[in-house]
Amino acid sequence: KLMTAYLTFAAIKQGTIKLDQTVPVSEKAWKAPGSRMFIQVNTQVKVEDLIKGMIVQSGNDACVALAEAIAGGEENFAQMMNREAQRLGMKASSFRNASGLPDPQHYTTARDLATLAGALIRDFPEEYSKYYSLKEFRYNNITQPNRNRLLFLDPTVDGVKTGFTDAAGYCLISSAKRGPRRLLSVVLGAASDGVRAQESLKLLNYGFQFYDAVQLYAKDQPVSNLKVWKGGSSTVKAGFQGDFILAVPKGFAPRLQTELVSQQPLMAPVSAGQTIATLKVSLDGKPYGEYPVVALEAVPVAGAIGRAIDSVRLWFK
């Protein structure tokens, strides 16, 4: 449902659908098993109501209706989900439906879910703050509370999403903001609703107490100038489109080391925002994380002479 929300917000931003637009409820959406917001077949429902039903009530029916409105069908929408997962760097995920219902080819990991949740908060901050902290939603004369218990237990928690299937157990992606810092936690396979909330709160408290937020690079600060072949410019500035901040155990920041691994040969054209390198971070010589580095500017293709010269240089490289 988190990926479905991400793609829904993207579709609204692109003008594919609108918040106040009504969409038809198909029989497939109406029959969706599991948790529902109880939309009725052959009726029209506002997109914003479907968003609330999906996020607050965990409505599988709402997910199917949104998928059909955006992509014309759930299978097409699943293809969009997989493309977006690749773009976001979710390396161990495969999507087959919009709701997260069990399927042998539908899977993900805690790391990938954290990546997705972080991307949603980063890319759609207004939508996140508007919908994910809602404590209840009423539709079709039925009021359902948000299944995220932490919203009622800790005022610093403002999301994100619960999940449950017999195979996966009780799951919770949670986020809290205390002062300027925001942390995410992911708990999968808990034995009960209470356990997933308890373990999530433990993780958040531990993170805030024992980790520092360390900024390694500022937004649009060049990490390096990388060589570009056959381009109008011979180099391109590489960096991050937002402040690059890591959670690091308290007192360990001076022991971090970084290594930039570029994608060579890097050929023009290069678009701004294109991933062109990886920043490898280590702590005390042990891998700590790998993070995509993007082009901070565009580099067009060079003219015929410039391309020919670089072709010769590449031949002897």
Region locations from a protein language model:
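Domain-terminus/edge residues, biased toward the C-terminal soluble/receptor-binding domains
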Residues: 90-91, 102-107, 111-317
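Active-site-adjacent loops and short helices of periplasmic peptidoglycan-processing enzymes
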Residues: 2-114, 118-123, 137
